[in-house]
Amino acid sequence: MTIALGKFTKDEKDLFDIMDDWLRRDRFVFVGWSGLLLFPCAYFAVGGWFTGTTFVTSWYTHGLASSYLEGCNFLTAAVSTPANSLAHSLLLLWGPEAQGDFTRWCQLGGLWTFVALHGAFGLIGFMLRQFELARSVQLRPYNAIAFSGPIAVFVSVFLIYPLGQSGWFFAPSFGVAAIFRFILFFQGFHNWTLNPFHMMGVAGVLGAALLCAIHGATVENTLFEDGDGANTFRAFNPTQAEETYSMVTANRFWSQIFGVAFSNKRWLHFFMLFVPVTGLWMSALGVVGLALNLRAYDFVSQEIRAAEDPEFETFYTKNILLNEGIRAWMAAQDQPHENLIFPEEVLPRGNAL
């Protein structure tokens, strides 16, 4: 018996190999296997948003005008959430609510679930695209890991939070002014700005912006080989092949400024990755907590003292009153189906009033 040792090679390519060759071919815009998820989902999400903001009203779900057709502009148009009565229905076009009627589907808010779900899978497809390309060119997958931060925020805010509440109605609608309304809602009903997870998110995002500005300025400041132009801007060449800045000079500069400085590029760039991604993940965790109506930082002793002593008031107690005002004024308008009526005497007023 003869045993042949060696690598097995197929004589003919099967369908998988043919698809793999075509999908991963070197072209101007890489497609890849991830593109099978990314491109259709991104196309439908963006297309659904443009369709909704252009033509579709929110009269039947929120009692609002929300399209260019009704007179909104770019800042006030939105694809709004379904009515609260529809709870967590996927609102499929062929489902029991719309029954295949496209106009009725739009009126019920079906475009919101369409955009939200295709948007989520589109973002996941983009992260998989970064994994796939990193694998192809033998890079580590830190870009994809970093992009998990925005995905975590999107999924927690647009999907997990409303799943914890009574329906998609309480998710943000897809529009600029609609997001502002949602932020006010979060503050009034959850005191979100005093939540430690929100604080970590703000520190991460603003800290990352600061690090980015400092890093870019420092690299530009420490270039030691450049063009021969008469001024900085003519001498600067963005297509320079190799890096010609001095890490040693940058280290000395910041050591003199702060007393401490990054000693190598790896630690510096890891820190620039760690700060924003951790901030985004922490804020996403905080929103998951809000989905379960968890409370954070209720300083009850100050509230009791403020209620008993007309001369005692803190910024915290003033903010609590503002939150009560947001709830009282917003709930009646934002949830008309609840028929909430607040008489004047129960509306909150601070000690100064």
Swiss-Prot record:
It is a multi-pass membrane protein. Keywords: Acetylation, Chlorophyll, Chloroplast, Chromophore, Electron transport, Iron, Magnesium, Membrane, Metal-binding, Oxidoreductase, Phosphoprotein, Photosynthesis, Photosystem II, Plastid, Thylakoid, Transmembrane, Transmembrane helix, Transport. This is Photosystem II D2 protein. One of its GO terms (biological process) is photosynthetic electron transport in photosystem II. The chain crosses the membrane at residues 41-61, 125-141, 153-166, 208-228, 279-295. The D1/D2 heterodimer binds P680, chlorophylls that are the primary electron donor of PSII, and subsequent electron acceptors. It shares a non-heme iron and each subunit binds pheophytin, quinone, additional chlorophylls, carotenoids and lipids. There is also a Cl(-1) ion associated with D1 and D2, which is required for oxygen evolution. The PSII complex binds additional chlorophylls, carotenoids and specific lipids. Chlorophyll a PD2 binds at H198. GO terms for molecular function: chlorophyll binding; electron transporter, transferring electrons within the cyclic electron transport pathway of photosynthesis activity; iron ion binding; oxygen evolving activity. PSII is composed of 1 copy each of membrane proteins PsbA, PsbB, PsbC, PsbD, PsbE, PsbF, PsbH, PsbI, PsbJ, PsbK, PsbL, PsbM, PsbT, PsbX, PsbY, PsbZ, Psb30/Ycf12, at least 3 peripheral proteins of the oxygen-evolving complex and a large number of cofactors. It forms dimeric complexes. It comes from Jasminum nudiflorum (Winter jasmine). The modification N-acetylthreonine is found at T2. Chlorophyll a ChlzD2 binds at H118. Fe cation binds at H215, H269. It is found in: Plastid, Chloroplast thylakoid membrane. Photosystem II (PSII) is a light-driven water:plastoquinone oxidoreductase that uses light energy to abstract electrons from H(2)O, generating O(2) and a proton gradient subsequently used for ATP formation. It consists of a core antenna complex that captures photons, and an electron transfer chain that converts photonic excitation into a charge separation. The D1/D2 (PsbA/PsbD) reaction center heterodimer binds P680, the primary electron donor of PSII as well as several subsequent electron acceptors. D2 is needed for assembly of a stable PSII complex.
